[in-house]
Regions:
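Basic amphipathic alpha-helical segments that dock to polyanions
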Residues: 52-59
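Amphipathic alpha-helical dimerization/coiled-coil segments
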Residues: 1-4, 92-120
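N-terminal helix-turn-helix DNA-binding core of bacterial DNA-binding proteins
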Residues: 8-51, 70-71
């Protein structure tokens, strides 16, 4: 069923998690994903281009993200109107990310419970 599919595909690696998180609000192109992941992870995850594009290729193949065309809206005339590839989460990708976030919440809640001594 759907549950076994989810189990096989989570937990996500940190790189995959942050890439998907980066795409959860709006489509982004490769370089913007790299910068965003670095900032979101507070420098824990610094992606090389090779790692990023390998991950994007895999995510496209899994159907978790898709390519969209983004028209550059730039004040620089040369750039303006040029199309570049951006990536966005699919509805399946959103579902996977949501499940992973819930999984992480459970892990953190357990730690909080144990370390604050709040358990019965």
């Amino acid at each position: 069923g759907g549950d076994s599919f989810i189990m096989e595909n989570t937990p996500l690696t940190e790189a995959t998690y942050f890439i998907m998180l980066s795409l959860s609000r709006e489509p982004r192109h490769g370089y913007a994903i790299m910068k965003d992941v670095q900032s979101l992870s507070e420098d824990r995850v610094i992606l090389s281009t090779g790692t990023l594009y390998g991950a994007l290729k895999r995510l496209l193949k899994q159907g978790w993200i898709e390519r969209v065309e983004e028209e550059l809206d730039s004040s620089n005339d040369e750039e303006s109107g040029r199309i570049r590839k951006a990536y966005t989460l699919t509805s399946l990708g959103r579902r996977i990310l949501e499940i992973e976030i819930n999984r992480l919440h459970v892990l953190v809640d357990a730690a909080n419970l144990r370390t604050t001594g709040a358990e019965a």
